[in-house]
Amino acid sequence: MDSWSYGRSVFMSNETLLPCDTFAKNRRFEQRLSNNDDVLISDMAGNSNGFSAVSITKVVPEEEDEENISSSSKFSSQELNRIDFKLRSFLDLGNDDDDTSSRGFALPSKKSRASNLCSQNPLCQVYGCSKDLSSSKDYHKRHRVCEAHSKTSVVIVNGLEQRFCQQCSRFHFLSEFDDGKRSCRRRLAGHNERRRKPAFYFLPGKRHKLLRTSQDVVGNKFLENSSLVLPESFPGSLLYRVIDEDDHRTSRLVSFKDEPTCSMFPTNEQNSSRTYESKPAIYSTEVSSIWDLHETAASRSTRALSLLSAQSQQHLSKFPNTTFSITQPNQNLNHSSSTDYHQMEQPLWIDPGKTNSAGSSSCKGKGTSTVDLLQLSSHLQRIEQQRNYTGDVKQEYNELYFPGS
């Protein structure tokens, strides 16, 4: 305290500020601030009552100001990133804790399951067997059946009579198997369908067209499952298949054109009766479709008819007691789209010993019907007449079986 602050008048309190006091205080404040050059007293004004208002501003260089601002901004961004990182790590830790807690329930079950599999040796599941399969193949281990019971026709599994299917690799009821089969009926049907491909014959002249045999070709049967006959071996004519009736085996295919004598009538050395099955010329150089195939066979029928009539008289006189059969085409012709050109009926048995004065022989079948050679020739003539009925049908089936040709 200054000396003049003591001994004031009674009428004046110690708290009363005099102008001299304010001036002295202001001087001391200036001296205190003079030690700090950064502080500037910008405004000091006196009031009527002796008080003054002083505004103090701090003078800071611009470089330091920018560094402080950048440091404060960096600090704030670092703090924010740190806080954000802490929050994220906290959330991740929480999720990891949840995952580990959920995994903690799942992992022991897998370990226990694996330990159970390792601890227990695979055994055959057939009742009464219980064979240890640890030294068996992996296939038998996987399906829990021993090698012997995998091929057994009847076993008991789960109290029921079953059998092991080799394609399904599991046990089925006995009703699902055919007799003597090791695979179930359902799998075996699909297996046979894939394995049994339909047979095809190739007809030259139609740009590698394949023609299906047997029932698939307009329902006819004159293309049967026989061996391929090349056009070099048998150039177009009527073919006859010689069949031994004793053992029903096919011996050869002969032609009217090549061997008229040997193919039609047997010799003395041939003791067994033979069946001569009529076959059309399957392969020829001029054949281009199934209809051209028939026309080629029909055009050669007159030659076969002449050979038949010329040789019959000569050979029937030589062998009076020989019995043979010739398969003839059926005379009942159906002109609908579902029938073929000629169908084969039962072979006719011709007994050359029973001949009439006109030179024709009577033909007796396995029934009681008889047919002479004139009726036989009429059958061959009808083959030639069939071309009159092939106008619209030929065009329809050529479009059906040979499209775009």
UniProtKB/Swiss-Prot annotation:
Q: Name one GO cellular component term.
A: nucleus
What residues bind Zn(2+) 2, as annotated? C165, C168, H172, C184
Q: InterPro entries recorded for this chain?
A: SBP-like, SBP_dom, SBP_sf
Which keywords describe this protein according to UniProt?
DNA-binding, Metal-binding, Nucleus, Transcription, Transcription regulation, Zinc, Zinc-finger
Write out the residue ranges of the motif Bipartite nuclear localization signal: 181-197
Mapped zinc finger ranges (SBP-type): 121-198
Needed cofactors, names only, are: Zn(2+)
Record: residues binding Zn(2+) 1: C124, C129, C146, H149
Q: Which GO terms describe its biological process?
A: defense response to bacterium; regulation of DNA-templated transcription; regulation of gene expression
The cofactor remark states: Binds 2 Zn(2+) ions per subunit.
Give the function comment from the record: Trans-acting factor that binds specifically to the consensus nucleotide sequence 5'-TNCGTACAA-3'.
Q: What is known of its domains?
A: The SBP-type zinc finger is required for the binding to DNA.
UniProt name for this protein? Squamosa promoter-binding-like protein 6
Which organism was this protein described from? Arabidopsis thaliana (Mouse-ear cress)
